[in-house]
Amino acid sequence: MVRKIKDNSVSIGSDHRGVALKNYVYDYMIPNTDEEPTKFNISVMQDVGVYDSKKAIDYPDIVAKVAMDLEYQSHGILICGSGHGVTMAANRYPHIRAANCRTTKDVKLARKHNNINVLCMGADFVSKDEAWKMIRAFFTTDFE
């Protein structure tokens, strides 16, 4: 079976510890008006949750939702407290190449050399400013 993947489409999710950073990243990526194009020419952007930082959730549940979306979407972003849990869970899926990144340099290397399609971040270690730079690198760095 051949699956058709939508170019520059993204599914984003987090556990309860990553909600604030996920919301920041999501809000950064969507256009301010209907006429404004999305940043990085995103054709589809799906927020799979969670939406409440006070309600604990098992991160594998969110990873499963992003993994399902990546059957037809090109990119995924996963956020938890450290980034390690979502990375390990994501890499269990055969169509996912995930890396836990903490710097823009990490993202660029992972895209260039490993062709990651899922960026994982730890909300306890990545600032909003660094996350913004990492997202930009994720969508603008090509595999060599």
Segments from the language model and where they lie:
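Generic secondary-structure signature for well-ordered alpha-helical cores
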Residues: 30-35, 43, 68-72, 112, ...
